[in-house]
């Protein structure tokens, strides 16, 4: 029986890069790993309506740099950067107070090309009791307008309140999961409805990277917002 590997982990070093970038001794590794989990959980909980696509964490000595990629930077930044300062102070309470924390925000210009945001859109629609086929169709149309070369969406659970759970999926275009050079974005989310939990999976195919192409890094650039706030 075939087994499905995680599309992002399968392509690390080829089309994907690690979301956490740091080195540690075997003694400190588990501590820093738990810190990363706490940082991501806290930010997603505090900014649940900010359309956050990804959070990258870089560590250098006693510095922790948190890079937030969001489609709604205004919610993260707050008025005059107050949101960033509040977030940084909250993270200081969670982590070692001796560590210097920097928070940078990068705006996502096309949210419909991010699997995380597409999956969140579908879960929000399902939780509002929108029919799953309509929610999936709208998500597929939005992804196609974002110039993705292929999209696949699967919804599992008690669809439309059916007594027997099942899975249904839709695919438009190409989604070559076994091609390592294919730039595949993937996300899994859960929708909590009155009938139970529905699982939502989204695959987006953004094209193939040539052998000489480098993994695109999410780093502060001209699109970065408020780089001096730390």
From Swiss-Prot:
Give a GO molecular function annotation for the protein. Answer: rRNA binding
Q: Which GO terms describe its cellular component?
A: chloroplast; cytosolic small ribosomal subunit
The family database entries (InterPro entries) matched by this protein are listed as: KH_dom (IPR004087), KH_dom-like_a/b (IPR015946), KH_dom_type_2 (IPR004044), KH_sf_prok-type (IPR009019), Ribosomal_S3_C_sf (IPR036419), Ribosomal_uS3_bac-typ (IPR005704), Ribosomal_uS3_C (IPR001351), Ribosomal_uS3_CS (IPR018280)
What protein does this entry describe? Small ribosomal subunit protein uS3c
Q: Which family does it belong to?
A: Belongs to the universal ribosomal protein uS3 family.
- Does the record bear Plastid in its keywords? yes
Provenance organism: Porphyra purpurea
Keyword field: Chloroplast, Plastid, Ribonucleoprotein, Ribosomal protein, RNA-binding, rRNA-binding
Q: List the disulfide bonds.
A: none
Coiled-coil intervals, chain numbering: none
Task: List the gene name.
Answer: rps3
Database matches in PROSITE patterns: KH_TYPE_2, RIBOSOMAL_S3
